[in-house]
């Protein structure tokens, strides 16, 4: 098969392929970018595979960076872009179900493509826009099937993260997982306990944010992979409830919204501890906790202006979206009106600072000054005090007197 048109991202990288070939080696575009162009999706990173060994690649290009030379990868800086050029390679036994014990460089493209995870990721594209398809990936792409390259059991035994990648691809592409591939995923799911939590989170997060996340969750349940992920043991019924409650066409707007929904349906008592187990950042944990706090607040009452100031219209809107998906009462317009009525959205916007008050009224740092600053903030947020220097100073003068 040949592409009618080579996308600009590949055209910009053509000089790299041409220089490698001019030096007597083979070079191809490989990986997700080739799959994405075949699907008509936006192209992200353009990766190149070559028969040139790392030291040979470095001799071809004046500007390179060693970023993974032990695995055959050299970063080539060309025409204002940087491209990862990786030597064709085979991999020995995997020591920890994630990394090969040894990488061997080879001159054969087919040997290199054999080690890929799924047939739809095992394409190569040459400089003339010809697609090299050694494993019938084009057929699988057309039939929307996710199939492991070669022996599925071997692929997942080599790298158990491929199980999560498979679930994620099903969710992103709306592909069905081929029967033998799925059986191997289910049989090898216990190996997910060997995988770093951070890597599992990245894949799971992409699954939740995907347009067909429901398919991903259904596959997660059917494969029983959840039993081998942090704090998700025996949660099939709760995942099923999430699928039942949220409509078919609902998609999550942000990762934080998605994980807040997950924690809500899993009835997690300590969200911070749960998210720490998934090795998420402090900022991520705080945002999810805020979303859950807003959700609980909304169970009791409507949103007030102070809520918009405390949590932000953005987070309040995310919770309203989730409530709307659940068929609960929502008021997006009310949040918008309250947000527009706020004269400040952060205390740093207050024109008078603590130092100004200390100078104007001979105040000392301490609890009393903090109390006055909090009063100023509360009055401005409530709309009872203008955020103007003179108005604030007059207010403080009255409070002190």
UniProtKB/Swiss-Prot annotation:
Pfam families linked to this entry: PolyA_pol, PolyA_pol_RNAbd, tRNA_NucTran2_2
Q: Which InterPro entries match?
A: Bact_CCA-adding_enz_type3_sf (IPR050264), CCA-adding_enz_C (IPR032810), CCA-adding_enz_firmicutes (IPR023068), NT_sf (IPR043519), PolA_pol_head_dom (IPR002646), PolyA_RNA-bd (IPR032828)
Signal peptide residue numbers = none
- Which annotated residues bind ATP? 32, 35, 116, 159, 162, 165, 168
Q: Which residues bind CTP?
A: 32, 35, 116, 159, 162, 165, 168
| Keyword annotations from UniProtKB, A to Z | ATP-binding, Magnesium, Metal-binding, Nucleotide-binding, Nucleotidyltransferase, RNA repair, RNA-binding, Transferase, tRNA processing
The UniProt record lists the keyword tRNA processing: yes
Entry function: Catalyzes the addition and repair of the essential 3'-terminal CCA sequence in tRNAs without using a nucleic acid template. Adds these three nucleotides in the order of C, C, and A to the tRNA nucleotide-73, using CTP and ATP as substrates and producing inorganic pyrophosphate. tRNA 3'-terminal CCA addition is required both for tRNA processing and repair. Also involved in tRNA surveillance by mediating tandem CCA addition to generate a CCACCA at the 3' terminus of unstable tRNAs. While stable tRNAs receive only 3'-terminal CCA, unstable tRNAs are marked with CCACCA and rapidly degraded.
Query: What protein name does the entry list?
Result: CCA-adding enzyme
Its encoding gene is what? Answer: cca
